[in-house]
Curated annotation (Swiss-Prot):
HAMAP family (alphabetical): Ribosomal_uL30_A (MF_01371_A)
Subunit note: Part of the 50S ribosomal subunit.
GO terms (BP aspect): maturation of LSU-rRNA from tricistronic rRNA transcript (SSU-rRNA, 5.8S rRNA, LSU-rRNA); translation
Similarity field: Belongs to the universal ribosomal protein uL30 family.
Keyword match Ribosomal protein: yes
Annotated Pfam families: Ribosomal_L30
GO cellular component: cytosolic large ribosomal subunit
Keywords, sorted A to Z: Ribonucleoprotein, Ribosomal protein
Protein name stated in the entry: Large ribosomal subunit protein uL30
Keyword Ribosomal protein set for record: yes
Gene designation: rpl30
GO molecular function annotation: RNA binding; structural constituent of ribosome
């Protein structure tokens, strides 16, 4: 699973990139989505790579951000009790590990919003105009996206 976080805004941006971010459900800065590792999603992420940060998320980090930032319809927080009653998993950690392994999707939890509205990272982004390999905050992070997500929890 990939975690994709929008880092830059879309003012004065090409229409195809705006539409790609819209298809990824990224409408605002610091919003995060969890997408499967399919060629279709990877193509969309590569098209928007200059506006997003992305990488492979692990189960522990995903469980943390689902606990802190997961929301249900009506802006209610995602709780252990709701996951137990709505799915066959006993906790958010079990659901997160199944999600990372590809056994389940986000939409399998009814009323779970697909977008996680994250806090800006503590200590800030390095720079939003350079890629991660150049010392910035854009593009492919690999497994180090987990550090960014923990800073944004």
């Amino acid at each position: 699973m990939y975690a994709v976080v929008q880092v830059r805004g879309v003012v004065n941006t090409r229409r195809d990139i705006k539409e790609t971010l819209k298809m990824l459900r990224l409408h605002h800065i610091n919003h995060c989505v969890i997408v499967p590792e399919t060629p279709e999603y990877l193509g969309m992420i590569r098209k928007a790579k200059d506006f997003v940060a992305f990488g492979e998320v692990d189960a522990a980090t995903l469980a943390t951000i689902l606990t802190t930032r997961g929301r249900l319809t009506g802006n209610k927080p995602l709780t252990e009790e709701y996951v137990k009653s709505a799915t066959s998993y006993g906790s958010i950690e079990e659901f997160a590990s199944a999600l990372v392994n590809g056994e389940v999707r986000m939409k399998d939890v009814p009323e779970l919003k697909p977008v996680l509205r994250m806090h800006p990272p503590r200590k800030g982004y390095k720079t939003t105009k350079r890629t991660y390999t150049q010392g910035g905050a854009l593009g492919y992070y690999g497994t180090e996206i987990n550090d960014l997500l923990i800073k944004m929890r």
